[in-house]
């Protein structure tokens, strides 16, 4: 949606809930 490439990289690097929550906040 907004940036699936960055969200996927951050989700795997930090966590599933943290990556999703940050993607929704941005």
From Swiss-Prot:
List the GO terms this entry assigns under cellular component, sorted alphabetically: ribonucleoprotein complex; ribosome
* GO molecular function ontology, one term from the record: tRNA binding
Superkingdom as given in the UniProt entry: Bacteria
Q: Where is this region: Disordered?
A: 1-26
Tell whether Protein transport is among the UniProt keywords: no
Which Cys residues form disulphide pairs? none
Protein keywords: Ribonucleoprotein, Ribosomal protein, RNA-binding, rRNA-binding, tRNA-binding
Q: What does this protein do?
A: Binds 23S rRNA and is also seen to make contacts with the A and possibly P site tRNAs.
Q: Which family does it belong to?
A: Belongs to the universal ribosomal protein uL16 family.
Kindly state the subunit structure of this protein. Answer: Part of the 50S ribosomal subunit.
Q: What is this protein called?
A: Large ribosomal subunit protein uL16
The species this protein belongs to is Geobacillus stearothermophilus
